[in-house]
């Protein structure tokens, strides 16, 4: 049995009863597998006996020492809860240690007895004494139970100690060692000098030495990253091949030539990569990602033109009606001279318009379909669907994506991410995808200038904005709330829209938020694009997709309430032309350390990939990319940032394996085949 199959109940393990199981459940430990993979958060190195350091140089230290008790005395207020020990350590003069709230141990620390003790000791200059409150002690012996070892320290909850968890883990491991089997192929162990799975699990929980502990960590990191990538790659390797297409670039080249600007080198490379995949005998699965304003949407559109030219249909999915409408309008303008039939399909369409749209999709007269979730519906039938483009892919589930692909045969799929994803994370999360990166911005774009300002300096910001408005430019204001809340002392869209109408009386101010009807949101955005609205007050609903080249200023109030990637996305709504743009972050003090870090990072960095990496380090992948539902993202031991080199190595290893595994041992191939089958049989989603 593989480790992922050890989903047996915990009751009985190490004498666990219902109360103990409940406590482990509070730590998200629900079965034997979870318990085995509940790795320590740190370790106490009790291998070597130490003497107290020179207090003139060191005021605090974690250490294990040995001392003999020479005397003791209770002290403190009338309750006398504290204990003062006079002790003699190795080769040292007698000195005193304070044990806070430990007077009840007077009869344990008997005079002339020798003890091991491990604790965080702190030196107090005023009393001239070393003190500790939480410690572990044991009567001195040649074979101590908890000393002269490296002990694991686990995350805890009420009623549990690291010692108890160690006992439970020990019995769970014995069970696995008896009935389990490895899921690490030998070629990985030999090439990277890894431990066996059994040895790695034993050493991670009960290290025999610091050297073996590091080897165990390395092994389990490789294993976790390997399995993550292997499962998705294995699935894609079993995709049936199709007949190759012989696509032309004629229409693509005509449209590119008609553009009033030149594509960036990254855009050209991405289009070529996609074109190669579309012509191959294997359906494409590719992730297209780039920084804010890098031109991903244009690349996606252009890449579909060879298929439309050949008589196939292309579906372009957006997460909201507003964004779908914007894409439709922009693409219509680009394709107008080329007689390409387009259809918009959203849930907010009137019944008659929706019926017409569905009919044009069904009979094949529509080559490019832009829409929202409505494209997924059973009533939406395609005549010749060949290519699916999904914008903001994380907002659509795997099942939805597969349903859309199943509306055609051998359908190619391109996923786009609004948030730049660090390379190491993309290679792991999307192990079954090829990845195209667009890092360069279109020519002529100027770097956005970012300013930080404390609340109370609004008038200075308003004065700056007036100068931009006088030039005919437009402005955004973003707030964390739609309406006022009794829970939070935060500015909101409704009230600030009224105030800003007073402040900027000579200009047109309107607001946009998620609770407005779809048709009203579309009307407001049309007015903003046509410069009938000068100032748009909104929530973070504008963070993705809004594209108004004439808008040069963005003001975010209560900026400390927003995440790094969200702030970067919001900033990306300006700077979308050759006009100099400005980003104002108004924050309210006091700031948390994380809040200070976010604001400092966003001010000093314009690179979305760098910002995403810092956000990944801060918040983890689930929160950052909206992927909380994907349980496999909760890594047990690997780290997407710190272990990026291993991620790349494993990716390259799997490239070789899936390209030609004839050089690999049959035992390894059989192991991985069985592993994949057992994973599917266990009901896992991959």
Swiss-Prot record:
Spans annotated as Wedge domain: 47-148
Stored PROSITE patterns: HELICASE_ATP_BIND_1, HELICASE_CTER
Gene Ontology biological-process annotations: DNA recombination; DNA repair
Keyword annotations of the record: ATP-binding, DNA damage, DNA recombination, DNA repair, DNA-binding, Helicase, Hydrolase, Isomerase, Nucleotide-binding
Entry's free-text remark on domains: The wedge domain within the N-terminus inserts into the replication fork junction, where the lagging and leading strand split.
Family: Belongs to the helicase family. RecG subfamily.
Assembly information from the UniProt record: Monomer.
Protein name (record): ATP-dependent DNA helicase RecG
Gene: recG
